[in-house]
């Protein structure tokens, strides 16, 4: 009788696996096609962030992961979305999130839905900004709320983190900001989206709730090259 092998991921393991994949896609780009690499990075980091939120919610109470708590623990029933997990962590778990982070989580979910269920048009710079901001949030949340470090004595000790900082300047700036002063911001009104021209762009994330684009706001002139 042959050896039987079990493949198993708990919530945290599932989340960190996806985030590690996003990290590798950014830090070790190599000769990979940028369009495919960044699309996969957005998908995996969005998946990982949602599962990190659910894992934190599970630690409040496992039943809270289910959309209808009475359905716990049926795997055929729907679990909460990232929005739902965020709301329950605030109202039941007692956690606080900056407006900037709440906007990020919601915009990230919308972008992932566009990729997986419809169509997605973006630029390399926009995609890198999405991934950079999401990775910074994920690493901060995992350590602060779940006691998990992606880079440390018990995890990765190679030069991946240095490579990640060099590969994505948005990530580097976000990490520096979180380390220095946190990430609290006041809510801002929606602004004009430069892509669809609707007043529907979130001032914190730069994500448009109508067309899905994430606009990079800067005083410096840049050329945003499409894939």
Language-model features: locations:
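Charge-enriched, short contiguous segments at helix-coil
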Residues: 13, 36, 94-153
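Short Cys/His-rich zinc-binding micro-motifs
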Residues: 190-202
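Short Cys/His-rich micro-motifs in 6-15 aa windows
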Residues: 200, 211-222
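Short, surface-exposed loop/turn segments at secondary-structure junctions
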Residues: 31-39, 63-67, 124-125
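Charged alpha-helical initiation segments
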Residues: 1-42, 153-191, 206, 213
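Flexible secondary-structure boundary motifs
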Residues: 53, 57-105
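Long amphipathic alpha-helical segments
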Residues: 58-65, 125, 144-178, 224-225
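Short, hydrophobic, well-ordered secondary-structure elements
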Residues: 38-59
């Amino acid at each position: 009788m042959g050896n039987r092998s079990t493949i198993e991921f708990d919530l945290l393991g599932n989340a960190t696996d996806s985030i590690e994949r996003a990290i590798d896609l950014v830090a070790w780009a190599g000769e990979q096609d940028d369009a495919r690499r960044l699309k996969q990075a957005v998908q995996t980091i969005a998946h990982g962030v949602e599962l990190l939120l659910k894992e934190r919610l599970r630690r409040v109470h496992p039943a809270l992961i289910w959309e209808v708590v009475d359905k716990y623990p049926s795997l055929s029933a729907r679990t909460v979305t990232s929005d739902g997990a965020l709301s329950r962590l605030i109202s039941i778990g007692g956690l606080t999130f900056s407006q900037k982070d709440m906007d990020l989580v919601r915009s990230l979910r919308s972008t992932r839905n566009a990729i997986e269920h419809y169509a997605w048009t973006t630029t390399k710079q926009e995609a890198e900004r999405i991934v950079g901001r999401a990775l910074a949030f994920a690493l901060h949340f995992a350590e602060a709320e779940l006691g998990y470090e992606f880079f440390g004595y018990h995890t990765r000790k190679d030069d991946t983190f240095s490579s990640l900082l060099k590969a994505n300047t948005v990530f580097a700036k976000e990490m520096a900001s979180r380390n220095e002063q946190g990430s609290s911001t006041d809510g801002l009104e929606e602004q004009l989206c430069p892509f669809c021209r609707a007043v529907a762009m979130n001032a914190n994330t730069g994500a448009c709730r109508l067309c899905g684009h994430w606009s990079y706001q800067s005083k410096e002139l840049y050329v945003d090259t499409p894939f």
